[in-house]
Every structure is written in structure tokens, then in C-alpha cells.
Design a protein with these regions (language model features):
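Paired acidic/hydrophobic, glycine-rich loop segments that form the ligand-binding mouth/hinge
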Residues: 84-87, 211, 228-233, 249
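Conserved C-terminal helix/tail region of periplasmic/extracytoplasmic solute-binding proteins
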Residues: 324-349
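Periplasmic-binding protein-like
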Residues: 135, 199-204, 243-267
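Mature extracytoplasmic/periplasmic domains
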Residues: 257, 261, 266-326
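Extracytoplasmic ligand-binding site segments that recognize negatively charged/polar headgroups
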Residues: 39-46, 82-83, 87-223
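Short, low-complexity disordered leader/linker segments with a strong preference
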Residues: 1-33, 348-349
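A ligand-binding cleft/hinge motif common to bilobed small-molecule-binding domains
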Residues: 92-95, 223, 229-246
Length: 349
């Protein structure tokens, strides 16, 4: 009997020791990290990011996916502590910062930050989160349907494209980039020459079938032949080309207007240490490489080398240094006025 009791005690001790080891290996077991993120590529994000991070830490990830604009509203209305991390475009980071929704973070904990391109380390200032991918604005068109060859933003004004193109709404992630592109096409300057820029947009209106807020819907319009060309960010080209390999990507002659998608901690996060670990994980070599191989995001790590096939759709290599990046403080200050004038221009066909 004594031997049986001793054996049971030994087994209990072994189980408790195993539990202690597991707890030490996964110190975040039982914690839930709530992320506000994009709605697309959910399966690939689960495979490349969420599942490996949960396996590594023992935490549970809840990913709330929606468009940038919808998420800004949700975050503004959320109670403190409802969210931990926001993954969103640069223009919307500025809006959230102005509303006090973005917390600073301890960049000394980001062990992968040194491998990131300098202009992606702290785009919104020291103490705020890094970019995890670049993007650039271009034109996707179907040469089988399009009556002209397109090489520039200025080509979109060609009368042969009447009611045949899509452009981003000014409130879309790429909207301000297109505004800058229009200005460059005609030798104008945002802020200084707004009257002239909107006059050019009014001239473009007969060609515009859609001012979109959803890139996916715009690609559907391309596929159905409702439009022959669309102004899109580069990552949308991967989706478009998978539907029709004939689609052509154009780096506009006016230049590479671009920006970032970024990672930040939400003010009031109950899991800030875990949130910072997640942001660092997002910058890791294996994760960035996997995302690039799957055509999800271009890497911000300078040490990742892509073959021609995987690099062709991304803002990669020398292009990173060629990006024309808007002053987002300036854009944020002017966006309400631009939006009002945009709606006046495009609300009635």
C-alpha cells in the first residue's frame, strides 16, 4: 500500500513538473490577443502568422477583419482594452494617433527591427510601430479590352477610356496617393494647387465608371469587362493576375507614389508585452519570407532575397528607395476639405 501511495505521489509530482515546464515554455498561455486587421488573405495569415505565434506562445489570437475605414470607426467606439494590436494603412494610423488610440511601444524589445529598411522602422516617429510591408500605386489594365496602351496617370484622361476606368475614392487607403499622382501628371502641387487638381479630376469624370472603396470589387469589374483599367495598389495585382494572366501592371511615368501598412499597439491594451512580441514576430525572417512566397505582402527586411517571379508584383529592392511618400500630417489636415470637394465632383454622374 505504501508503495502504491509513493508511486501515486511520484506521478503527481511528475505531472506538476511537466506542467511547470510547459507553463515556462509558453508563458502567455491563457491570454487572448485581439487584433484589428484586414479582411483579405485570412487563410494565409492564419497559416503564416497566427497559428505559428499561438503555437510559440500558447496564447489565443482573435482577428477582427474589416476595411480600414470601418476599423477606424470600430476602434474609436471600442472600450479601452477591447483591442491589443492594429494592423492598418499609414493614413489611418495618423487618424488613430490623433484620436489617442495608438500607444507607444518599447522598440528595444523588437529584436528584428535592425533588419528592417530604415524608412520602415518608425514611419510615424520614434516610439511608434514599424511598417511590415510597402505598397505602391499603379495601374492595372486589360490589353485585350483597353483601346489604348497605358503608361502613365495622364493616359487615363484619354477620351477613348470613357466610362471605362476605376479610381480609388479619396478616403480609400490609396486615394491620397492618387491625388498626388494627378498633381504630378499635370505639374501641380497638393495644397497649393487644389483648385487646378480638382478641375483636372472633373475633366476625368466622364471616364470614371467607379470610385471604389473595395479593391476586390474593382478586380471583379475588370474580370467582367465593366472596366478595362483600374488604379490599384501593387498587392492587388497578385489577385487580379490570378484571375487573368493577361492583365498588365504599370508603374506610372509620374513616379512611384507609395506608403506602408503598419503594426501598432492600441492604447489600453491589457496584453502589451504580448502585443510587442507579436509585432516583433511579424518582422521575423521566416514570417516575412513566407508572406512574400505566398504573394501576400512584400518584405520590409533588407536581408530577404526574392526571385524574379515573386518580386515582380512587389515594392522590392531598389524600388523601396524610389518611393514618393506623402506627408501624412499634411494629408490628414487637408483630407476633410479634399473629401468634401471629391464628393461634390463625383457624387453625381
Amino acid at each position: 500500500m505504501k508503495k502504491l501511495v509513493s508511486l501515486c505521489l511520484a506521478l503527481l509530482l511528475l505531472v506538476s513538473l511537466c506542467g511547470a515546464v510547459l507553463a515556462e515554455d509558453k508563458p502567455y498561455a491563457g491570454q487572448t490577443l485581439t487584433i484589428s486587421t484586414f479582411a483579405f488573405n485570412a487563410e494565409l495569415l492564419q497559416k503564416n502568422i497566427y497559428d505559428p505565434f499561438m503555437e510559440m506562445t500558447g496564447c489565443t489570437i482573435v482577428a477582427d477583419g474589416a476595411s480600414n475605414a470601418v476599423r477606424v470607426t470600430k476602434l474609436a467606439e471600442a472600450a479601452e482594452g477591447d483591442y491589443d494590436v492594429v494592423i492598418i494603412g499609414d493614413m489611418f494610423v495618423k487618424q488613430l494617433m490623433a484620436e489617442g488610440k495608438i500607444d507607444t511601444l518599447d522598440t528595444s524589445k523588437l529584436t528584428n527591427l535592425d533588419a528592417v529598411y530604415d524608412n520602415a522602422k518608425a514611419p510615424m516617429g520614434e516610439g511608434y510601430g514599424p511598417a511590415y510591408t510597402f505598397n505602391r500605386l499603379g495601374i492595372v489594365y486589360n490589353p485585350e479590352d483597353c483601346p489604348i496602351e497605358i503608361t502613365s496617370f495622364a493616359d487615363l484622361w484619354d477620351p477613348e477610356l470613357r466610362d471605362y476606368i476605376a479610381i480609388p475614392a479619396i478616403t480609400n487607403t490609396s486615394g491620397p496617393l492618387f491625388y498626388y499622382g494627378v498633381a504630378a501628371a499635370f505639374g501641380l502641387e497638393p495644397g497649393k494647387d487644389d483648385d487646378a487638381i480638382f478641375a483636372k479630376l472633373a475633366e476625368l469624370k466622364p471616364n470614371v465608371k467607379s470610385t471604389y472603396t473595395s479593391a476586390n470589387n474593382t478586380i471583379t469589374m475588370l474580370n467582367q469587362g465593366e472596366i478595362c483599367a483600374a488604379v490599384l495598389l501593387d498587392y492587388s495585382y497578385t489577385t487580379a493576375k490570378s484571375a487573368n494572366p493577361a492583365y498588365v501592371w504599370v508603374n506610372p511615368a509620374e513616379g512611384l507614389f507609395g506608403g506602408y501598412n503598419m503594426l501598432n499597439v492600441i492604447t489600453g491594451s491589457k496584453n502589451k508585452e504580448l502585443a510587442e512580441l507579436f509585432i516583433d514576430f511579424y518582422l521575423s525572417f521566416d514570417l516575412q519570407y513566407a508572406e512574400a512566397m505566398d504573394g501576400v505582402d512584400c518584405p520590409v527586411r533588407a536581408d530577404i532575397v526574392l526571385d524574379e517571379e515573386h518580386a515582380q508584383n512587389f515594392t522590392y529592392g531598389e524600388m523601396v528607395n524610389q518611393l514618393i511618400l506623402p506627408d501624412w500630417d499634411f494629408v490628414t489636415a487637408n483630407l476633410p476639405g479634399w473629401t468634401e470637394r471629391w464628393n461634390e465632383t463625383f457624387s453625381v454622374k
